[in-house]
């Protein structure tokens, strides 16, 4: 339904979870004609294939493990898109992961840890996760783990390494897991824009 609305002002649609829509006008319309719609997934092969078949961008939410392990999913996505006849700028991949940038790796680890521990404590109680483990935190915050927590050189190098596996066009960092001081958050944003982004661009250009 969302895709139908995105394509046309007047929508006629039949589905399985709501009553039919017959010639309904949906307003207001996007300024640029169409909304950019992505399919988000935590690593489901069917979701990757579906995004490819629909010709939509795919965004992988990576919260643990080795991000490079998503490479087969990115390949499946692109293969499915090609088989469905979809090519061009809409066939792209993004990654969303935990991360925080500080002047030094040790500062980043120290600053991100309280929010991470609180999240695992609260959510773990609800979901049956094991208690927060400092060793697990450190493993995920160093390559090949899924947390992009470090200084600008470290984070940039790891983003570029992941790009060699996924070919992703965007990399989102979820920095605040709750309680992150504003000055720490703003410094991380500033370093992302002024230090990490230029490094990533230079490294990719030289590859």
What residue ranges belong to the model's regions?
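Active-site-adjacent structural elements that line small-molecule/cofactor binding pockets in enzymes
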Residues: 1-207
């Amino acid at each position: 339904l969302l895709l139908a609305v995105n394509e046309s002002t007047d929508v006629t649609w039949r589905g399985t979870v709501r009553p039919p829509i017959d010639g309904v006008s949906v307003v207001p319309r996007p300024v640029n004609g169409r909304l950019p719609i992505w399919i988000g997934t935590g690593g489901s092969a069917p979701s990757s294939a579906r995004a490819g078949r629909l010709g939509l961008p795919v965004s992988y939410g990576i919260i643990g493990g080795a991000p490079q392990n998503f490479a087969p999913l990115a390949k499946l996505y692109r293969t499915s898109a090609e088989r469905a006849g979809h090519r061009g700028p809409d066939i792209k991949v993004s990654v969303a992961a935990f991360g925080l940038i500080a002047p030094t790796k040790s500062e980043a680890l120290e600053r991100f840890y309280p929010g991470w521990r609180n999240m695992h404590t609260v959510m773990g109680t609800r979901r049956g996760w094991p208690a927060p483990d400092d060793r697990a935190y450190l493993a995920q915050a160093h390559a090949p783990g899924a947390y992009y927590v470090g200084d600008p050189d470290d984070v940039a190098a790891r983003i570029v390494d992941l790009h060699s596996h996924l070919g992703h066009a965007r990399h989102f960092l979820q920095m605040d897991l709750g309680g992150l001081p504003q000055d720490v958050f703003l410094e991380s944003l500033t370093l992302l824009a002024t230090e990490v982004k230029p490094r990533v661009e230079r490294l990719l250009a030289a590859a």
